[in-house]
């Protein structure tokens, strides 16, 4: 890999030529990501080489998203390698985690620091936040209007009436 890098090959060229990722350790993770290697491929190569990635933060800093990393499985493909807690510790924001597919409930349950305000800013609705247990006052403090909360209550009551009749 050092010979490739010192010969001024980009990470894309050895990839196109069919070089194995496990033999491209001289390239920065960022270069490997730009070359088109997935988070799964990079993680598998490090695991196969018995190398330890210092932390998930390295992959994050290489430009992999929470979504990319949340989809990485263990080599036997039976379960996810990186948990929501791992992604939070690596510094991913509530918005990045929402984009990765995590629900408001999962985020609230995983981290007491994810307030109604933070989850609202991440793009969750007042209804979603109410359903996971935030109080009306917390929702108002997060910037939702009283009218929005009244509408949620009205819709909730209408739904209950409908379900009771059918």
Give short role names for the model-derived ranges:
Residues 74-76, 108:
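Extended non-catalytic scaffold regions that mediate assembly and binding
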